[in-house]
Design a protein with these regions (language model features):
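Acyltransferase
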Residues: 2-28, 44-45, 236-319
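A short, charged/proline- and glycine-enriched loop
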Residues: 31-38, 99
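A short, Lys/Arg-enriched amphipathic alpha-helix followed by its capping loop at the start of a domain
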Residues: 33, 53-65
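Pocket-forming structural segment of enzyme catalytic cores
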Residues: 43, 151-242, 313-315
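A short beta-strand-loop structural module common to alpha/beta enzyme folds
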Residues: 64-76
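Glycine-rich, highly charged phosphate/nucleotide-binding loops
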Residues: 80-98
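Cysteine-nucleophile active-site neighborhood
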Residues: 105-174
Length: 319
């Protein structure tokens, strides 16, 4: 949360350099505050588990959040009861006339398929296009991040030689990215995927910034320069036992799966996993909500559409 101080206090400049948000008294007295409206596009088959993980991550912020759950209407869920979806979820058709301060698009177990062959791809494309005028900032996770990067910036995914499976240490490439405020210089985050994206294409795109990654994971966190798109290729939201459940599931299927890296003490699946990413999850989601949504989204939420028009108009002046 911002700290309110007297205008022109000398400490303001120093604190701002450290990504500590300071608000002068004049701005604070005129600031309009309302709950944040966040839309969660839950593409995972285990919807209850995923929604719980996301809710837990969002709940660490002192900001009030109104969360709307959405499932794709173009695919019938095989793992979640239809009555559950009708009770707690909405469809795109039901929300397309509304506006949201933020949107979260989860991962999905379809990464080995070309995007266009995923049965709900046309609907997801429609949602992402709609989000340009109806959502202030979007947070993409794992396959969702790959899908968003492909749709908005034309960077496709590629299959890795071996599945990236475990908890990995990452470097921060930008000196002071506000999204990573409070992170240690190196941090840990789970990954569970067969595909990756090109670091070179990300670095060559002048509308993107690579914030964090490592040699084994490649890109881990990327943002668009206008802060409208945040791409996280790992799973900061994972529970302590999520990788273990995935490992046991694949073992039962008879799959040739390696023990998750940097997860079990001494790589022994009989021992309780080591949690290294809990603070990362809290900081990542809280920073996104605070700096990329709360501090920037208009109080009159419908003005998001006008802001998109103004951005496009300004962009056209430089082309």
């Amino acid at each position: 949360m911002p700290i309110k101080v007297i205008k022109n206090l000398p400490a303001i400049t120093k604190l701002a350099q450290e990504n500590i948000f300071v608000m002068d008294t004049e701005r604070a007295e005129n600031q309009q505050i309302r709950p944040l409206n966040i839309l969660l596009i839950n593409l995972m088959p285990t919807k209850e588990i995923t929604e719980t993980q996301i809710l837990r991550a969002l709940s660490n912020s002192p900001l009030q959040v109104n969360l709307t759950l959405l499932h794709t209407a173009s695919r019938k869920s095989k793992n979640t009861d239809e009555q559950y979806l009708e009770t707690f979820y909405r469809t795109f058709e039901e929300v397309e006339d509304e506006f949201f301060d933020g949107m979260i698009i989860t991962g999905a177990p379809v990464e080995l398929m070309p995007f266009e062959e995923v049965d709900y791809w046309p609907e997801l494309v429609e949602i992402m296009n709609w989000g340009e005028e109806h959502v202030y900032s979007t947070f993409y996770i794992c396959w969702g991040a790959q899908a968003g990067l492909y749709h908005h910036f034309g960077i496709n995914k590629c299959i890795m030689d071996e599945k990236l499976f475990g908890v990995y240490e990452h470097d921060i490439y930008n000196d002071r990215p506000v999204l990573l405020r409070g992170f240690d210089e190196k941090f840990w985050m789970p990954h569970s995927r067969h595909t990756t994206v090109s670091l070179q294409q990300i670095k060559e795109n002048r509308d993107l910034e690579l914030l964090a990654g490592s040699e084994p994971t490649g890109a881990a966190i990327v943002r668009s320069l206008d802060n409208k798109h945040i791409f996280v290729f790992g799973h900061a939201e994972y529970d302590w036992d999520t990788l273990n459940r995935e490992y046991e599931r694949d073992i039962k299927k008879g799959m040739d799966i390696a023990v998750p890296e940097n997860y079990f003490p001494n790589d022994d699946p009989k021992q309780r996993p080591i949690v290294r990413w809990r603070s990362v999850s809290t900081l990542l989601f809280t920073n996104w909500l605070n700096y990329y949504v709360y501090q920037e989204t208009p109080y009159i939420i419908e003005q998001i559409q006008k802001m998109k028009f103004e951005r496009d108009k300004n962009l056209g002046a430089y082309i």
